C-alpha cells in the first residue's frame, strides 16, 4: 500500500500519468478520451493500481498534514511507501524557505524510521547546478535534503541530449555503493526507462 502526495499535479492528472505508464497508452490519448482499442490495457492498469492500494492526495500541503495522513493510514491498515512530489512545495510556518525545507526533510526522515515506511521524496534541481554541474547535489536546499536522506539519486541529462539521461546515485547510506545508471526519457508516456 502506498500514498502519493502530489503537490504539483492535481490527483486526476497524476492518476492519468500512472495509467499511461502502465498501459503504454499515450497520456494525450487518455486526456482527450481517444482510447478506442486501448480500453483493456487501461482497465488492466487501473486494476493494477487498485491492487497496490495506492492513494493520491493533492490537497495536503504541510508536513504536519502529510505526517497525519501517513500515521492514519499506517494505523488503519498498513502502509509500505510514501512519495512526495516534490519537497520544495511543502508549505511551512516560517518565512525562510530553507528552514521550512530543513523541517520537511527531517520530518520525512523521522517518519520513515518511526513508522517503518519507505519514503521517496522528489526535489527540484536548482538552476545554478544545471549551468555549472559539479559534485554537489544541485537540489534546492541540497544540504538539508542530503543530511536527512539515506539515498540520493539525481537525474542528469548529458550535454546536447534531449531523450537520454543518467541516474546518478550520489549518496547511499545503507549500502555505500554509488554510480550511474543510463536511462532514456519517453515523452509520450512521461516515463523514464533503462537505456540499453
Name what the model sees in each region:
Residues 82-83:
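Walker B beta-strand of ABC/ABC-like P-loop ATPase nucleotide-binding domains
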Residues 16-18, 95-96, 132-134:
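Short amphipathic alpha-helical segments
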Residues 89-92, 154:
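Residues immediately C-terminal
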Residues 1-78, 92, 139, 180-187, ...:
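Cytosolic-facing regulatory segments adjacent to core modules
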Amino acid at each position: 500500500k502506498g500514498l502519493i502526495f502530489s503537490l504539483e499535479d492535481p490527483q486526476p492528472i497524476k492518476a492519468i500519468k500512472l495509467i499511461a505508464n502502465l498501459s503504454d497508452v499515450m497520456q494525450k490519448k487518455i486526456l482527450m478520451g481517444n482510447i478506442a482499442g486501448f480500453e483493456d490495457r487501461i482497465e488492466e492498469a487501473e486494476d493494477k493500481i487498485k491492487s497496490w492500494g495506492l492513494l493520491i492526495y493533492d490537497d495536503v500541503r504541510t508536513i504536519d498534514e502529510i505526517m497525519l495522513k501517513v500515521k492514519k493510514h499506517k494505523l488503519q491498515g498498513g502502509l509500505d511507501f510514501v512519495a512526495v512530489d516534490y519537497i520544495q512545495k511543502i508549505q511551512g510556518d516560517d518565512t525562510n524557505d530553507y528552514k521550512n525545507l530543513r523541517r520537511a526533510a527531517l520530518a520525512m526522515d523521522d517518519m520513515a524510521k518511526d513508522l517503518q515506511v519507505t519514503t521517496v521524496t522528489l526535489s527540484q534541481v536548482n538552476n545554478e547546478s544545471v549551468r555549472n554541474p559539479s559534485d554537489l547535489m544541485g537540489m534546492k536546499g541540497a544540504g538539508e535534503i542530503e543530511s536527512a536522506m539515506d539515498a540520493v539519486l539525481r537525474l542528469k541529462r548529458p550535454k546536447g541530449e534531449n531523450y537520454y539521461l543518467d541516474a546518478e546515485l550520489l549518496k547511499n547510506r545503507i549500502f555505500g555503493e554509488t554510480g550511474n545508471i543510463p536511462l532514456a526519457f519517453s515523452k509520450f508516456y512521461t516515463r523514464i526507462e533503462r537505456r540499453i
